[in-house]
Amino acid sequence: MKSVGVFALIISFSIVAESKIYTRCKLAKIFAKAGLDNYGGFALGNWLCMAYYESHYNTTAENVLEDGSTDYGIFQINSFTWCRNARKHQKNHCHVACSALITDDLTDAILCAKKIVKETQGMNYWQGWKKNCENKDMSEWKRGCEVS
């Protein structure tokens, strides 16, 4: 029985090790380099604010919704419309596996987020942004981060 407990502890450490929670400034640099500053007319602070309220900058965040779909990754991108998981009848507009949205490499998540902003009503897709960031001063989000 003791070995089962030790095994469970090892597994939990390996799961935690795979999760990455970025700092605000590290994410600001990644987002700026990826061209998110002013993408779709939204300043960098909007992206940082949205990612904070959607996932607290956690790349492996997953939330199962009442309709059975799942929101994935740092931007909480939904499986029903934007990515492909094991469920059928998904639109997969980003042409990406949902698992690609929960890795430390943010490339697929950023490309998909750009597509969402371009093909929907801007950042209104994200409830976290609407409730906490819309029509607010976004300059504080990048303050002290050495990004222009």
UniProtKB/Swiss-Prot annotation:
GO cellular component: extracellular region
Keywords assigned by UniProt, alphabetized: Disulfide bond, Glycoprotein, Glycosidase, Hydrolase, Secreted, Signal
MF (Gene Ontology): lysozyme activity
SMART domains named in the record: LYZ1
SUPFAM superfamilies named among the record's database cross-references: Lysozyme-like (SSF53955)
CDD domains referenced in this protein's UniProt entry, alphabetically: LYZ_C
Catalytic residues in the record: E54, D71
Top-tier EC class: hydrolase
Record's signal peptide: 1-19
Subcellular location: Secreted
Catalytic reaction list: Hydrolysis of (1->4)-beta-linkages between N-acetylmuramic acid and N-acetyl-D-glucosamine residues in a peptidoglycan and between N-acetyl-D-glucosamine residues in chitodextrins
Glycan-modified residues: N58
Domain C-type lysozyme, residue spans: 20-148
Superkingdom, natural source: Eukaryota
Enzyme Commission code(s) on record: 3.2.1.17
InterPro entries listed in its UniProt record: Glyco_hydro_22 (IPR001916), Glyco_hydro_22_CS (IPR019799), Glyco_hydro_22_lys (IPR000974), Lysozyme-like_dom_sf (IPR023346)
Disulfide bond residue pairs: C25-C145, C49-C133, C83-C98, C94-C112
Family listed: Belongs to the glycosyl hydrolase 22 family.
PANTHER family the UniProt entry points to: LYSOZYME C, LYSOZYME-LIKE PROTEIN 1-RELATED
Protein name: Lysozyme-like protein 1
Native species: Mus musculus (Mouse)
Gene that produces this protein: Lyzl1
